[in-house]
Amino acid sequence: MHEGDEVTTKEIKSYGNKMRLQEARDSANRLLGFRMRSVFEMKRRLKEKDFDQEEIDHTIQNLINKNLLNDEEFGRAFVKEKVRNKKIGPRALKKEIYQHNLADELTESLIQEVYDEFNPKALIESHLTKKRIKKKTIITEKDKKRLTDFLIRKGFYWDSIRDVYYDWELI
C-alpha cells in the first residue's frame, strides 16, 4: 500500500481483522508472560477482553502449535507448585485444579504423579513440625481436634492423618 492508493472497504475490513488477531496474540503473550495458563483459562481471559470466538480460537491454536499453551505441562507445573509451596493434600489440590477445567484423566494422573513425588504423610509431618508438635507428645483432645480439622482443611484424608498420628504416637 502506498500513499495515494485507493483502499476498498474489503481491504479495510481485512486489515482490521489482521489487527484484531495481532491484538489477541499480543494479549495472550502478555498473559503468558506472567505465568503458564490452561487452554480454558486463556479462552476465558481473551473472552473477557472482548475478542470474538474466531479470534480466540485462532490465537489458541497458534499458541498450541508453538507449544506455548499445553494443558499437561501447565497442570504438572501447577500441581507441583501448589504441593511444594502450600503443602496441600489431594482433596484440596483436586479442588484447586478443578477451576482450570483440565481433562479428568489428566487431573487424576497429575495428582497421582505429584503425590508419588511428595508423600502425603511427609507433608502432614511437616505441618505437625511447623505447629511445634513433637513425637510422643501428649496433646489434649481439643488440640487434637483443632489439628485434625486443620489437616482436613488442608485437603488430607483421615486415613493418612491417622497413620501419622499413630507413627508419632499422638493417639
Label the predicted regions.
Residues 1-171:
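An alpha-helical, amphipathic repeat domain used for nucleic-acid recognition
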